[in-house]
């Protein structure tokens, strides 16, 4: 070994690792096949209007596969005008079973069309740049109607394709019918004195209010009495207090905000020596797996969140590809699942 070889400076290990992880570029592909970068770019980008011999195209694509070439997302978006990213802006709600199913189905539907769904929960006092400014999504989706301030932010970032669009879908029609079905089911079972029990989670306050108001309106329409039994939290005696309040008001059945509240109410009623549903009936909402697993099992309202997720994904795809949007919303996706509690 010569002194020049031993004295030769070695490349730092972090630099060797960085080089090993370097992204394969179109220039690497061009060097491998001995063609110009322009020709290789035409093939890799499938540029229209270029006459490239088929055997040349195959050489380029074979080399790209062999080298592990992947187009740079930003460069591809710049060339095509699309990022193939759909951004789902989440509200500040708990990620419950229904929301997970909604996101899963929307993700599957978009993936089938070659799009990626990215979820984002913007903080009220966030210091980081909004994700829609860095990802350049083709469409921004939301589970609720966005506020005027949020819409202004999106428009300032150059985003015009936003779901839901009030001209195409009204999400309220899928949330308002659930409490009406709860009340109708209890009335059909002969109950004339109803109570409502909400959730104490502050993140759900708006949804709790909407469901309570809708249930109260349905009770008035049916000519039955309706009282508010209070909010229920997991892990304290609030469910017991709600059961006591409902009984004190003469209620024989409770409309629960969701199945978690319904399970807590049923447990509290049993501990107070009440029979369910003979002394107190309880109906939940959302039909989570737990509803069928407890005893007495929970009668609940099921929303086909999978169908709704695919429908909204279809609107997003139509906007992203400038293709016709679904003209009609899916049929009512809410049904009562009858079990033991009501």
Predicted regions mapped to residue ranges:
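N-terminal helix-turn-helix DNA-binding module of bacterial transcription factors
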Residues: 1-81
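An alpha-beta-alpha
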Residues: 182-224, 328-341
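Flexible loop/turn connectors
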Residues: 240, 244-342
């Amino acid at each position: 070994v010569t002194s020049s070889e031993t004295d030769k400076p070695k490349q730092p290990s972090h630099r060797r690792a960085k080089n090993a992880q370097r992204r394969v570029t179109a220039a690497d592909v061009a060097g491998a096949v001995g063609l110009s970068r322009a020709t290789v770019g035409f093939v890799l980008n499938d540029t229209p209007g270029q006459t490239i011999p088929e055997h040349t195209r195959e050489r380029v694509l074979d080399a790209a596969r062999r080298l592990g070439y992947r187009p740079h997302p930003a460069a591809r978006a710049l060339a095509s005008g699309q990022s193939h990213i759909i951004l789902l802006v989440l509200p500040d709600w708990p990620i419950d079973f229904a929301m997970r199913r909604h996101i899963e189905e929307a993700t599957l539907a978009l993936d089938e069309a070659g799009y990626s769904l990215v979820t984002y929960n913007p903080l009220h006092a966030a210091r980081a740049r909004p994700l829609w400014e860095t990802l350049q999504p083709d469409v921004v989706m939301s589970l609720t109607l966005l506020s005027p301030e949020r819409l202004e932010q999106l428009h300032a970032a150059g985003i015009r394709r936003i779901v839901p669009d009030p001209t195409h879908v009204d999400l309220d029609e899928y949330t308002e019918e659930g409490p009406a079905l709860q009340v109708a089911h209890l009335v059909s079972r002969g109950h004339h004195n109803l109570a409502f029990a909400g959730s104490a989670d502050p993140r759900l306050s708006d949804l709790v209010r909407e469901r309570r108001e809708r249930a109260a309106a349905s009770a008035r329409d049916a000519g039955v009495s309706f009282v508010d039994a209070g909010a229920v939290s997991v892990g304290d005696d609030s469910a017991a207090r709600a059961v006591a309040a409902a009984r004190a008001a003469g209620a024989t059945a409770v409309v629960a905000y969701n199945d978690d509240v319904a399970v807590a109410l049923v447990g509290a009623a049993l501990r107070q020596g009440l029979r369910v549903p003979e002394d107190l009936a309880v109906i939940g909402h959302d039909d989570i797996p737990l509803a069928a697993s407890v005893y007495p099992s929970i009668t609940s309202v099921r929303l086909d969140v999978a169908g709704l997720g695919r429908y909204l994904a279809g609107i997003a795809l139509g906007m992203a590809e400038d293709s016709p949007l679904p003209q009609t919303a899916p049929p009512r996706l809410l049904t009562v699942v009858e079990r033991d509690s009501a």
